[in-house]
């Protein structure tokens, strides 16, 4: 697949992080609706979610959504997002990732997060990349550790407590 003008494409050894194709957006909506509650705060507005995914592949106002592609098939999605009601300092990006259930445990989340983190530091002037996760999400916590992130405290948001993981530019460069 060729990238459109200005679209972000990140290539790894097995994965390609790329813009979602229009035909893939409904599938991503269904994946969101069927998400494990451990992974999301709440289901977003469908129209707004789909509109955001139509801008996939472009970093716009702190938001970037990319498909996680394995051999031409979408196996998940990775994103930066702006948390509702919480301002991020300049150069700080919050990240979310979701993989299809059938491909978990094979290192794809680790590779996607490493590729995305590196791209944010290299191309988006990131100083800090962080992500909240549910304390019970042991697989995601392990992925953060494998990629060099560390737990940086807790955050209470939307009535839930989240563990915050992060990595700074200096930590990324020193790994």
Q: What is each residue range found by the language model?
A:
Residues 56-61:
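Short loop/turn motifs at secondary-structure junctions and domain boundaries
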Residues 34-55:
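Conserved GNAT-fold acetyl-CoA-binding loop/helix
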